[in-house]
Amino acid sequence: CTILCGEIGKHLIEGIADGFVPGIIERHRALLDEVITVESAEAVQEMRRLAQKHGLFVGPSSGAHMIAARKLRERHKIEHVVTFFCDKGEKYINDYWL
C-alpha cells in the first residue's frame, strides 16, 4: 500500500510496502495511470515458476513484476509488455522460499 496510500503494510517482497517510495514515483505520481497490486504469496509462487519453467533465478519482486505485466496485458488487450527483473534469487536459497 506504500505507493497507493503512503502507509506501511505487511509483505514478503523486499522494497515493496515497507515505507519506501522511490523518488521517481514521488516526483511523477500525477503521471501514473494505474497501480497494479500483487499479493506477496502470488509473487513468491511466480518467482518459483520462473525458476522451474524458465530457469530464471530471480527474487519475489521479479515475480511481482511478471504478474503485473501479465495483468496489464490482459486488462488492456495489448500484445507485448516489457518489464525488468531487478533482483537475484541468491538471497532466497533456503527452504522457506523454495
Where are these regions (language model features)?
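Active-site/ligand-binding loops adjacent to catalytic centers
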Residues: C1-P60, Y96-L98
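Phosphate-binding loop/pocket of nucleotide- and phosphate-handling active sites
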Residues: K10, D18-G19, G23-I25, I67-L98
